[in-house]
Amino acid sequence: TIVECNTAYEGARNTTEKHLKLLKHHRWLDVYPVDLLDAEGPDMVLDIKKHKIIDKNYVGKDLAKYDSMLVLSHFKGHAMGGYGGALKQLSIGVASSYGKAYIHGSGDPSKIWTGNHDTFLESMADAAGSVIDYFGGNMAFINVMKNLSVDCDCSAVAEPPCMKDIGILVSTDPVAVDQACLDLVYAATEDPGQAHLIERIESRHGVHTIEAAAELGLGSREYELIEIE
């Protein structure tokens, strides 16, 4: 089952009705069972045991149907987070529409676009931790480093990819897999688009989400990279 939640911003996915219409348009419903976790309320509220900013996380109530999760993320740049990967998918991706605004506003949904930036990044780490705790470690993470644009897929008009495809990373540690992706971007010194993506990551202090997640004990920034041809 593919799981998804509604967005917190205007567009084709901010209501259940519009989201289902888009899924039908792209024929997802012809191929996969899709569960919009927050299609119906009320939200499930997860307590965050160890946190920096927020102490609760609002997720779609249908999360209660599942006891494990395979987190598939398109690794790329992001206009607010600097980059998007496993940690963002765990937090913003699993959060309900209200929960997304709550994380962006560091606990104040009314500040979804105006809150302190670093506390937003730390709130993402907080929220990610609550989902990890909920599943008790029954999780795996796949980051796809393909079509590497500075923009998220959620952008109405995303900038074309600026770097060559790098590969697909798999881990049971969301911190390690995101850190490895960043390291591979920095290692691609001969790619003419590298500087553009790094500028997006650094200008938004993207690494801070990884720093916060590691400090919260969600995983390790140290890893062994095993390459499979």
Label for each model-derived stretch:
Residues 1-229:
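Extended, low-polarity segments enriched in aliphatic/aromatic residues
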